[in-house]
């Protein structure tokens, strides 16, 4: 989406070619600013993992794109930035690698010495009783997140929900704001797994170019812990694209989005 859009800006430049875009303006729930959705890209994939010998592969089953791609014809620089921004975040790691920097995880081994934690309340998240904690860096000048943790109020201390924000004052190049929201569910076998991973970032690549808001929404489902066919790990490359990934039907995408 184009970020911080004004009615006046829609009368200028490239916007004149797409007058219908005026009706597409909406308010961003993350920033409360006006944004103009330009492009939607979807990917459906399956990830397989083997611990010994260690191997991980992602099989892309479907890809879909809708929108006005002309707005994003800014060369490889934007693509490089987005790949760096939208790295996978695992809060159970001690360190989170993001934007070519190292951030201390709010539940990592070094979290107590790096963050200040405040006990807010006991709340219900879905059907789970959770302790609500907020956290901020001990030193405001340090590279760190601010956010909220919702931890189960029982002996497991499992994380039910985590929200994190990277403020503008952190000084990361191109990034005006970054928000992460992750939610976890318990499987029938007792394991807690990530099910929802939303990341929203406001970018200002160049001062003379319209700011951009990019949102990545990831849904994880169908966790299976049964043995995997060895032949799948013999496929070449870490990312395998199925031959018909660009020709999936509307019915396929309707099922995937549920």
Where are these regions (language model features)?
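Short aromatic loop motif centered on NTY/YTY
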Residues: 165-167, 172-216
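Structured extracytoplasmic
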Residues: 1-132, 136-144, 202, 207-208, ...
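Feature captures eukaryotic membrane-trafficking machinery centered on endolysosomal pathways
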Residues: 114-186
């Amino acid at each position: 989406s184009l970020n911080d859009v004004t009615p006046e800006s829609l009368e200028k430049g490239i916007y004149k070619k797409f007058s219908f875009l005026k009706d597409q303006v909406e308010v961003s729930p993350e920033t409360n600013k006006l944004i103009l959705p330009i492009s939607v890209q979807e990917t459906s994939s399956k990830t397989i993992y083997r611990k010994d010998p260690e191997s991980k592969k992602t099989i892309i089953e479907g890809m879909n794109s809708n929108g006005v791609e002309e707005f994003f014809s800014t060369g490889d620089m934007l693509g490089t930035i987005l790949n760096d921004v939208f790295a996978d975040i695992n809060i159970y790691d001690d360190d989170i690698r993001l934007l070519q920097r190292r951030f201390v995880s709010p539940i990592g081994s070094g979290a107590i010495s790096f963050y200040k934690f405040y006990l807010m309340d006991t709340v219900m998240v879905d059907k789970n009783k959770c302790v609500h904690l907020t956290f901020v860096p001990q030193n405001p000048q340090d590279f760190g997140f601010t956010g909220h943790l919702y931890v189960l109020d029982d002996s497991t201390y499992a994380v039910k929900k985590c929200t994190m924000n990277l403020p503008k004052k952190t000084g990361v190049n191109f990034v005006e704001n970054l928000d992460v929201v992750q939610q976890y569910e318990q499987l029938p076998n007792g394991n807690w797994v990530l099910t929802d991973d939303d990341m929203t970032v406001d970018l200002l690549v160049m001062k003379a170019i319209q700011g951009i808001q990019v949102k990545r929404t990831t849904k994880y489902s169908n966790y299976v812990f049964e043995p995997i066919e060895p032949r799948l790990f013999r496929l070449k490359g870490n990312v395998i694209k199925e031959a018909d990934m660009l020709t999936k039907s509307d019915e396929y995408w309707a099922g995937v989005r549920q």
